[in-house]
Structure formats: C-alpha cells, structure tokens
Swiss-Prot record:
Role, per record: A structure-specific endonuclease that resolves Holliday junction (HJ) intermediates during genetic recombination. Cleaves 4-way DNA junctions introducing paired nicks in opposing strands, leaving a 5'-terminal phosphate and a 3'-terminal hydroxyl group that are subsequently ligated to produce recombinant products.
Alphabetized InterPro entries for the sequence: Hjc (IPR002732), Hjc_arc (IPR014428), Restrct_endonuc-II-like (IPR011335), tRNA_endonuc-like_dom_sf (IPR011856)
The keyword Chaperone belongs to this UniProt entry's keyword annotation: no
Subunit structure, as described in the record: Homodimer.
Organism of derivation: Methanocaldococcus jannaschii (strain ATCC 43067 / DSM 2661 / JAL-1 / JCM 10045 / NBRC 100440)
Alphabetically ordered keywords of this record: DNA damage, DNA recombination, DNA repair, DNA-binding, Endonuclease, Hydrolase, Magnesium, Metal-binding, Nuclease
Binding site for Mg(2+): E12, D36, E49
Biological process, per Gene Ontology: DNA recombination; DNA repair
Similarity annotation: Belongs to the Holliday junction resolvase Hjc family.
Protein name per UniProt: Crossover junction endodeoxyribonuclease Hjc
Catalytic activity, as annotated: Endonucleolytic cleavage at a junction such as a reciprocal single-stranded crossover between two homologous DNA duplexes (Holliday junction)
Active site residues per record: S32
Cofactor(s) annotated in UniProt: Mg(2+)
Length: 133
C-alpha cells in the first residue's frame, strides 16, 4: 500500500512542477481523498485529482470524482482527473465520465476523451481535418 501512495504522490509533485513552470501558483493537498492539486494563474483556477497506474485497466471510486466536482463547483475552478496511465499523462473532464456502479473503469478507451497537459493550460494545438488528410 505504501508503494502505491508513493507512486501517486510522485505524480502529484511532477504535475505540480510542470504547472509551476507554466506560471501557475500551485497548492498540493496531500491525503485529501478527492482533490490533490489546486493551481491558479491570472484568475484561471484548475483543480486536479491525480491517479496513476501501470496496469492496463484500473478503477476509480465514484466518490472521489463526486468530491472533485463538488469542490470545484464551490471553489470556482475547472476540475480535471489527471491520470498517469502506462507512463502517459492524460487529463479528463470528470463530467465526461460515466459509470454503472460504484467505480469508473479506466483503460485504453479513456484516451478518446482525454486531453494533454498543454491543452489543459491553454497551449494546445488545434488540428483541422484537412491537416490530417
């Protein structure tokens, strides 16, 4: 269990450093069970719940996502589920997640609704369909 926590806190610190490099002020709330990082820059507020796994499939408790959404609404920030999945950093709008039970399933299909770090901070590149053909 301790190793699992260490992996998660390492990812939180990595994301915190990336956000700070981009000019965000960041607060890490370790052990919060619902909100791990709060980042702000010039009136923009981003709120993250961070999860990491080396498995091809894992589960996130529905209550963790509900806490993220609730806190974000009260605080006035934009919520993101930040996932380090098989070494790749992905960000998901929690409103796009769906569940039939107590947990959300995270697997390769999550990439269909995920965005990358630069899209989260507003520096993403938008592609036109013509560019892909």
């Amino acid at each position: 269990m301790r190793h699992k926590y260490r992996k998660g806190s390492s990812f939180e610190r990595e994301l915190k450093r990336l956000l700070e490099k981009e000019g965000f002020a960041v607060i890490r709330s370790a052990g919060s069970k619902g909100v791990d990082l709060i980042a702000g820059r010039k009136g923009e507020v981003l709120i993250f719940e961070c999860k990491t796994s080396s498995k091809t499939k894992f589960y996130i408790n529905k209550e963790d996502i509900e806490k993220l959404i609730s806190f974000s609404e009260i605080f006035g920030g934009k919520p993101y589920l930040a996932i380090k999945f098989n070494g790749e950093m992905l960000f998901i709008n929690p409103f796009l997640l769906s569940t039939n039970g107590k947990n959300y399933v995270i697997d390769e299909r999550i990439k269909a609704i995920a965005i990358d770090f630069y899209e989260v901070i507003g520096r993403g590149k938008q592609l036109k369909i013509d560019d892909l053909i």
